[in-house]
Amino acid sequence: ICIKVETHNHPSAIEPYGGAATGLGGVIRDVLGTGLGAKPIANLDVFCVGNPDTPAADLPPGVIPPQRLLAGVVAGVRDYGNRMGIPTIAGAVAFHPGYLCNPLVFCGTVGIMPRNSANAEVKAGDLVVVAGGRTGRDGIHGATFSSIELTSDSEAQSGGSVQIGHAINEKVLVEFILEASRQRLFRAITDCGAGGLSSAVGEMGAILGATVDLDRVPLKYEGLSATEVWISEAQERMVLAVAPGDWEKLARVAADEGVEATAIGTFTGDGRIDLKWQGRVAGSLDCHFLHEGRPRQRLPSRYVPLPATAPVWSREAASLGATLLDILAAPDVASKEWIIRQYDHEVQGCSVVKPLLGPGEGPADATVVRGVLGRDRGIALGVGLRHRIGPLDPWQMAAGGIVEAVANVVATGADPDRIALLDNFCWGDTRRPESLGTLVEACRACHDVAVDLGSPFVSGKDSLNNVFAWTDAAGKPRELSIPPTLLATAMGQVDDVRRVVTPDLKRPGNRLAVIGLTRDDLAGSQLEALGVVTGGQVPRIDAPSCRETFRRLARAIRDGGIIACHDISDGGLLAAVAEMAIGGGIGATIDLGKVPALLGGAQGRHADLTIAFTETPCRFVCEVAPESATRMGEWLDGIPWAWVGEVVTAPELSITGCFGAEESVKLDRLARAWRSRKTSS
């Protein structure tokens, strides 16, 4: 199994549809170019955009309104993924004012290959073969453009740097590569991504070197210079190392599949990259100099932790029910059904747990696909994003995202001891010591948490300089940077997909338990975003304790004791229970006074609000049948947990406060609030 998640932020900021489409196409080729070619079996996407309600008057010049941008990137992923015949099955959408000018567009792909196809080796004398689309001027300097700050003039100046995608061409290319791999007709493969042929051939020939005749590269049209041919980022192209004796067979397979394949050079063994163009030498570089010759940069970094503050309750607290409705309607929490329904989840026939679940179509924590059709072993995919606390504590932001991603897949039934992680760092201007300091803290968190959880990072990507500069109406220079952001992706193994667990409530009479200790971690919460509270503790991660919680929960799921499970994240406990009730189409009771909690100074109504909506990580709500209830103490021995309610027939959520106050909210009101935001245009 292999997995990769890429970013395509700058291109999507100026051309949302094309930027997102080629972002997905590129990451599919990354997986296709792993080993001797992996079959893409699932896609994921995560979008971070500005507040969808931002008035047009507040947009800097050259910035696309968030609603229109989001619709564009969704359409790009939809059209490319659906036409490729790959299910887009997992993802998330996050909103923050800091993403107004610099949206973040993450695209990921999971692939599968035979074990004996995992290793590739280029040999001297192998042919350099380019297969797939033709080369044009589209995408030239795309990598350079993606590494600089955006401005009001970026669309006019760099529009040509956005690549042009063609999903059907890539679909045909995938079929050709998989068939050629099955017949062992090439020794190594990589995709033409950033830098085009220059990076693809340069990476494959990093030790051996290569000679390339640029005149042989198939072109879309005449008039390109040698430089343009060499660095074009035209899409749907792969570079293969082919033994001379296999070239004719490979060419026949390409012709049968309708793919153009051309031998453009040879891997030489002399340790140099030599380019020929129109009968002369167009370039010659020593490979060691090319890859190792640049001096290593040393940049200053500085990080000054922000002091913790006591929570300040900034307005009269509304009822728990009214606050819950507001949170369910908040952009980060509200249903993303309008996006999800545009994607094909069923193609290839391996989808098991899908993004919407239960009779009421509530949200999933993670999604699960079979690795091979007809077999019961599965792959669970989950993502974690704690963007709201990035400016407050980058270590906790990164750690929290990792723990959330792992919690999502464990809640679905993945083995916590067999989880692989990916990191995607998106930052502002790291030439500034303060910004680089926060990046260093986030990197430390990735190391620390991965070690404590026993989960390795197998891939990653960074996207820096996510800064937008403009001049306002008064002639004053302005700048907006994104908040420090780490997207964590977790991929876990599920031994038997028939035993997976989903969040939707199943049966009246079953009991509800909360696993994990609740603390007053209100900073960066949805409650704070609503303006109910300001400040408080940032959610804190104790990774060794989380690992023990994950293992205990996994054992209970494996033994069949857990019928439904939902991790507690955005919106806190009541939002999680409400989503479970919406999915199941049945009601629940919850007693906040029974929740295991360690609160600082919250009292009275503030204690209710804290327990209901704090976003302390590594907590779960579980539905347990009465016949399994007696074993919960055995399964969860040594970790905080408690019975807090039950599943009921009445279509409502009944809430009892810490001091006995009772209120209820009808299920249809919860569902309407959750589905109230349709940001589709």
How should each PLM-predicted stretch be described?
Residues 1-681:
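Glycine/proline-enriched, intrinsically flexible loops and inter-domain linkers
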